[in-house]
C-alpha cells in the first residue's frame, strides 16, 4: 500500500501530538495556537484531497482505503478546518484548557477518519469509542462547569449504553458468520441476512451508529449536549460527527446486500419516528441550539430513507446528504457563534434585528435554514430529492409521503427563526455586529455554495455515485 494514502491520518495524528506536547508547557498564546490549528487542519485537508483515488489496505486488512472512505475523509477534514475558523475567540473555553481543546478536536477527527475506513469489527468499535470519548470531554470543557458537565454526563451515559448494545450486536454477527472483516461480511451476510439472529445482530450493531447520528431512540443526548456544550463544540457535533456516522452506517448497511425484510421495516419505522419526533419537538424550542439539535434528529430520519433503499442510488444519495448537512449546519452555527459573541446560548428572539446588525449573517442564516427545510434551489432540496427518488425506486411511496409531510412541518419552525432575524425588532437598540472580513467572506462563499450546489449538483452527484460504487 502507498503510505501517501494514509497521509491524512498521519498529519491529523501528528497535529494532535503537537498540541499535546504544547499543553505540557507553561506559556500559552491563544492567537498563535489558533493560527497553528488553522494551518495544520488546512494541511490535513490538502492531504485528503491529494490522496483521493488511492486504494489499498493496511494493518493486516483491518483498514481500507477506497474512494468511499476518501470522500468522507475530505468532508471530515473540511469540517475540522471550518470549525477551527470559528475558534479565534473561544470565549466559552477557559484559556488554560484551549490546547487540550485542540488535542481533543484533532483526536476526534482522526478517530472518525479511521471509522469511515474501518474494515474490521475491532477497528469500528475502537474508532467509534475514541471519537465518542473525545466528544464527551469536549462537551464538558465549557466554562460554565455546571451546564457543560451535566450535558457531558448525559451524553456519556447514553453513549455507553449504545456502545454496550453495539458490541453485543457485533458478537452476534461474528457468531453467525465467523467473520470479523467487513468486506468478508459483505460476501457472507446476503446469504444469512434472513436469519433472525443476524437481523437482530445487525440492528444492535447499527444502534451504535444511530447514537452517533442521533436517530430515535438514541437521540435524547442531543438537545442537552448541544445546549450545554460551547458553541464551537456544538457545531462540530452537528457537522463532522454526523458525516462520520453517515459514512460508517452506509458502509455497514451495504455489507448486507439487498437486506432482509425485517431490517428494512425497522429502519423505516426509525426513520418515520425520527423525522416526526425531531420536527414536532423543534417547534416548541426557544433556544436555537436545542432547535438545531432536534432538527438534526429529523435529518437523521431523512438519511435513513436513502440508506434503507439498499441500492446504489440510495447510498449515493446518503453521501450527497452528508455533504449537504455539513454545509447547511455549519452555516447556521457560524451565525450562532458570531451573534452570541460572548459564548453564551442564543434564544431565537435574540436574533431580532439581525438583518440590520449584519446583513451577510442574516442572509447566511436564511439560506441555510431554507436549505435545511429543503426549499429549492438549495443543496438541501437536492439532497432530499435524491433520497426520495431512491426510496420511490424501491416502492417506499408511503414513507416518502410521510417525509414530505415532515418537510412541511419543519418549514414552520425554520420560518420562525427567519422571521425573528428579518421581521422582529429588538427591545432595545443594538450595535452592529463586528464580523471579521475572513468570516464575512466565508459566509458569502457558503451562501454561494448552498445555492450553486442546488442549481448545479451534477459534479457532486457524480462523486457521490462513484463513492457508492466503491462499496459494491
Curated annotation (Swiss-Prot):
Identify this protein by name.
NADH-quinone oxidoreductase subunit N 2
Report a single Gene Ontology molecular function.
NADH dehydrogenase (ubiquinone) activity
Family that this chain belongs to: Belongs to the complex I subunit 2 family.
- The disulfide bonds in this chain are none
Report which gene this protein is encoded by.
Answer: nuoN2
What is the protein's species of origin? Syntrophobacter fumaroxidans (strain DSM 10017 / MPOB)
Task: Share what the entry says about its subunit structure, partners included.
Answer: NDH-1 is composed of 14 different subunits. Subunits NuoA, H, J, K, L, M, N constitute the membrane sector of the complex.
Q: Which InterPro entries match?
A: NADH-Q_OxRdtase_suN/2 (IPR010096), ND/Mrp_TM (IPR001750)
What exactly does this protein do?
NDH-1 shuttles electrons from NADH, via FMN and iron-sulfur (Fe-S) centers, to quinones in the respiratory chain. The immediate electron acceptor for the enzyme in this species is believed to be ubiquinone. Couples the redox reaction to proton translocation (for every two electrons transferred, four hydrogen ions are translocated across the cytoplasmic membrane), and thus conserves the redox energy in a proton gradient.
Amino acid at each position: 500500500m502507498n503510505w501517501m494514502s494514509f497521509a491524512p491520518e498521519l498529519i491529523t495524528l501528528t497535529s494532535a501530538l503537537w498540541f499535546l506536547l504544547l499543553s505540557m508547557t507553561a506559556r500559552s498564546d491563544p492567537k498563535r495556537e489558533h493560527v497553528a490549528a488553522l494551518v495544520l487542519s488546512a494541511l490535513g485537508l490538502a492531504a485528503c484531497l491529494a490522496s483521493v483515488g488511492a486504494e489499498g489496505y493496511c494493518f493486516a486488512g483491518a483498514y481500507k482505503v477506497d474512494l468511499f472512505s476518501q470522500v468522507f475523509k475530505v468532508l471530515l477534514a473540511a469540517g475540522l478546518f471550518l470549525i477551527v475558523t470559528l475558534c479565534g475567540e473561544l470565549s466559552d473555553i477557559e484559556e488554560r484548557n484551549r490546547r487540550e481543546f485542540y488535542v481533543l478536536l484533532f483526536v476526534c477527527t482522526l478517530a472518525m477518519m479511521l471509522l469511515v475506513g474501518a474494515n474490521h469489527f475491532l477497528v469500528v468499535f475502537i474508532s467509534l469509542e475514541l471519537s465518542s470519548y473525545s466528544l464527551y470531554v469536549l462537551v464538558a470543557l465549557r466554562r460554565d462547569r455546571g451546564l457543560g458537565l451535566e450535558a457531558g454526563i448525559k451524553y456519556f451515559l447514553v453513549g455507553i449504553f449504545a456502545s454496550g448494545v453495539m458490541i453485543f450486536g457485533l458478537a452476534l454477527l461474528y457468531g453467525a458468520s465467523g467473520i470479523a472483516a467487513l468486506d468478508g461480511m459483505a460476501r457472507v451476510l446476503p446469504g444469512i441476512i434472513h436469519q433472525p439472529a443476524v437481523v437482530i445482530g445487525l440492528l444492535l450493531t447499527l444502534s451504535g451508529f444511530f447514537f452517533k447520528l442521533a436517530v430515535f431512540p438514541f437521540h435524547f443526548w442531543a438537545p442537552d449536549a448541544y445546549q450545554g456544550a460551547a458553541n464551537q463544540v456544538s457545531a462540530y457535533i452537528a457537522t463532522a460527527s454526523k458525516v462520520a456516522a453517515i459514512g460508517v452506517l452506509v458502509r455497514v448497511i451495504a455489507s448486507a446486500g439487498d437486506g432482509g425484510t425485517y431490517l428494512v421495516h425497522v429502519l423505516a419505522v426509525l426513520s418515520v419516528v425520527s423525522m416526526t419526533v425531531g420536527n414536532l419537538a423543534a417547534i416548541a424550542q426557544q433556544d436555537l441550539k436545542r432547535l438545531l439539535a432536534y432538527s438534526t434528529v429529523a435529518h437523521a430520519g431523512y438519511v435513513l430513507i436513502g440508506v434503507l433503499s439498499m441500492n446504489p442510488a440510495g447510498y449515493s444519495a446518503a453521501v450527497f446528504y452528508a455533504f449537504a448537512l455539513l454545509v447547511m449546519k455549519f452555516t447556521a452555527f457560524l451565525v450562532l457563534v458570531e451573534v452570541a459573541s460572548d459564548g453564551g446560548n442564543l434564544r431565537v428572539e435574540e436574533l431580532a434585528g439581525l438583518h440590520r446588525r449584519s446583513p451577510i449573517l442574516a442572509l447566511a442564516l436564511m439560506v441555510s435554514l431554507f436549505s435545511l427545510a429543503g426549499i429549492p434551489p438549495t443543496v438541501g432540496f437536492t439532497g432530499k430529492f435524491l433520497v426520495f427518488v431512491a426510496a420511490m425506486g424501491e416502492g417506499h411511496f408511503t414513507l416518502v409521503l410521510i417525509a414530505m409531510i415532515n418537510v412541511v412541518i419543519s418549514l414552520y419552525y425554520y420560518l420562525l427563526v427567519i422571521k425573528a432575524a428579518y421581521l422582529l425588532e429588538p427591545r432595545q437598540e443594538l450595535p452592529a455586529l463586528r464580523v471579521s472580513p475572513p468570516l464575512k467572506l466565508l459566509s458569502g462563499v457558503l451562501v454561494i455554495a448552498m445555492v450553486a450546489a442546488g442549481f448545479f449538483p451534477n459534479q457532486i452527484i457524480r462523486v457521490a455515485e462513484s463513492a457508492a460504487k466503491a462499496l459494491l
